[in-house]
Amino acid sequence: LVIGGGAPNSTLIAGALAAFLAEGVEFDVISASGAGVLMGLLATAPRDASPQAALMQWAEVGVADSIYKLFPVNYKVFKKPGAQAESYRDAMLNQFQQMPGLAASPFAAMFSQQFAEASAKWNDWMHLMMSAMSPSDLHSGSLGLCAHLPFLEQSIDFSAVPRMAPEFYINAYNLDRHRMQIWNKDQITAAHVRASLSFPFLYAPTEIDGEHYIEGAALDTLNFTPFITDPDTGVAPAGEVDTLVVLDILGEDRLIRKPRNLYDAWVRSIITPLVKISQTEQRLFELEHNRDPVTGAPLRQVLKVDLMAGVPQDHWPQVLDWSASNMQLLFQVGYRAGVDFCRQHGELLGADAQDAPLAA
């Protein structure tokens, strides 16, 4: 399974992964990049939740539409940087833990109902107020806008990562060595996941052992490297596989369109080059790395889940929004695409459908 980058339309991937779980599909190897890393870990090593519940709850991190129309930023995911901001979040956490009727953490427990007695809109409004009051050390010398996923350890059980059944690979680009770095499940820590999600400008490069990394998906939106023969060893890191299933949410020309406003223009300035990178990567892999050098026959079958076919035509301008309605709609679209894919290729995938209702 190859899980590509992309956010906030990552709920398409979350929906498809939830469908795979419901259909009893298991993978021997998972290779992820960008936001796909988080989606893959939610499906294999979630903390304090079942994989399906964790994926479905990801669709709930969008901002209530009534607020998003006025302030189109996901302050629930993107937090202010700096030591003071971190102390503020910790202090607020301690206060909320002592308040009856409220869940443990409005900042860390991103996948729980933070205000148990409150509506979703009130919950999001409280998030906005607390985020607005948060201090920040952001200045002209900062290397990125946001804190590196402060909720990560409360979402992923990193002690379970080495024990997960499938092999798991993630990528990040090493700025000091000028090469892509691949880590396997025995190497992955929270720091490595933060490195794999450190998209330039949004986040400062992540430092690991004195070296600096940015998001691998900024350059390789699909992490095919584990399936490519290493010239030094003569074998691919992931070993021999006969079928690749690809979850790609960037290689779609309909993502390139006229922006609706200045903020949308900025978002699309990030996405536009990634569309062609994703398309080119898939063609390059199939033509150069997935061909028998003697016969020219494909080395393995490559199946792509058509995640975006079910997106309503009139909804495409909103596909990159962090609004609650968009993220929930895309989850439903991704789930249906995943189910259809499993029904079409069930025998090949070894699907064994479970009784698991769709809810998001």
Residue ranges, per PLM feature:
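A short alpha-helix-loop-beta-strand transition element characteristic
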Residues: 157-169
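Patatin-like phospholipase
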Residues: 7-140, 146, 152, 185-195, ...
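C-terminal helical/tail subdomains of lipid-metabolizing enzymes
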Residues: 147, 282-360
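Conserved catalytic block of serine-dependent lipid acyl chemistry
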Residues: 2-6, 36, 170-294, 334
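Short loop/turn motifs at secondary-structure junctions
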Residues: 26, 72, 240, 298-301
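Amphipathic alpha-helical segments that form well-ordered structural scaffolds
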Residues: 147-154, 192, 226, 333, ...
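Flexible glycine/proline-enriched surface loops and loop-helix/loop-strand junctions
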Residues: 131-136, 207-211, 314-320
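A general structural motif
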Residues: 26-27, 165-167, 239-242
